[in-house]
A protein has these predicted regions:
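Intracellular loop-helix junctions on the cytosolic face of multi-pass helical membrane proteins
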Residues: 1-132, 147-148, 152-161, 165, ...
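Short helix-loop-helix connector
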Residues: 114, 224-228
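Membrane-embedded alpha-helical bundles of multi-pass transporters/translocases
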Residues: 84-99, 105-109, 136-156, 160-218, ...
């Protein structure tokens, strides 16, 4: 062990995170001129929580080796495994920022489209307005899961490609980005004055749902296998935070768009604000997928499935 008072860098990092989180909440309460007006309590509180978790995680990682000899090695290794999984979770938050907007941004886009009642295969008795397209997601999930398990994954294995959990999750993030590119192309057509059928939205829904199956279901299995028995409940709790922080990315982006300088820049691109944001979120997903792939190549897999 280090001498008393030495090697406490992790404590300083964690303390800095706590102080910064408190400072952010105080800044929101006082409302100085330099604090963004669009950062209300929800955004500020989520940012403060993110800073607290990030700095706490880094600080804990730096201090873990000091705990050996005081705490059992298994306990120390369990905490380190949780910290590694949290990085994986953090890299999936951009996916949720895209996925959750299907119930808002995509519905708004769909309301500008024409409902194709004239198509013989269109279920007019089920889909009478854009919001009802949401029912396509759970229906596709029930089809895609058995397709992946019975057809896609065995086919990949026969080709010598093992669809590991991390590979599936990274691919799922990419598919979410592709879905938003398709949605952006549809938005360009709408902005150009074309009459676009709501049926075209089936493609981004299909791509996004395929990504959801690869990310969401796989991540739960992955986290369960990586966490030790004592930490499985903890890791599940952190998983539910990924959706929260995914929504935070959307809040921050929308707050940034309301800035005059950003609005002026969007105008120079020739795109509408909606189209610009769709392509922005697609790029955000691709950047996250690259970061995910880089980390996944270095991730030391564990096997902590329950045997009884």
């Amino acid at each position: 062990l280090s001498k008393q008072g030495e090697g406490r860098t992790g404590l300083y990092v964690a303390a800095f995170g706590g102080a910064l989180a408190v400072f952010m909440l105080m800044a929101w309460a006082v409302g100085p001129s330099w604090w963004p007006e669009d950062f209300g309590f929800v955004i500020t509180a989520c940012l403060a929580l993110g800073v607290l978790i990030a700095c706490g995680g880094v600080g804990t990682s730096l201090q873990l080796e000091r705990a050996r000899g005081i705490h059992p090695d298994d306990t120390v290794d369990s905490v380190r495994a949780v910290l590694r999984v949290l990085i994986v979770f953090a890299l999936t938050t951009p996916f949720w920022s895209l996925f959750d907007q299907k119930a808002s941004t995509w519905v708004i886009q769909g309301r500008a489209m024409a409902i194709p009642h004239e198509l013989w295969w269109w279920p007019s008795f089920l889909v009478k307005e854009a919001g009802q397209m949401q029912a396509l997601n759970p229906a596709l999930v029930m089809l895609i899961i058995p397709f992946n398990n019975l057809v896609l994954y065995p086919a990949l294995r026969r080709m010598g490609v093992e669809p590991t959990a991390l590979r599936r999750m990274g691919t799922g993030i990419v598919f979410a980005g592709i879905a938003w590119i398709v949605a952006g192309v549809l938005q360009l057509a709408l902005d150009g004055g074309a009459q676009v059928s709501l049926a075209w939205q089936m493609w981004p829904y299909l791509l996004l749902t395929f990504g959801e199956v690869l990310v969401s279901a796989t991540a739960l299995e992955f986290a369960y296998s990586q966490a030790t028995q004592a930490m499985k409940g903890v890791i599940m709790a952190f998983w539910y935070l990924t959706s929260t922080f995914g929504s935070l990315w959307v809040l921050l982006t929308n707050a940034g768009v309301r800035n005059d300088a950003v609005t002026a820049h969007i105008a120079t691109t020739g795109l509408s604000e909606n189209a610009f944001l769709m392509f922005f979120f697609a790029a955000f997903a691709f950047a996250a997928a690259l970061g995910f792939a880089w980390y996944a190549r270095r991730y030391p897999m564990q096997d902590n499935y329950r045997t009884a």
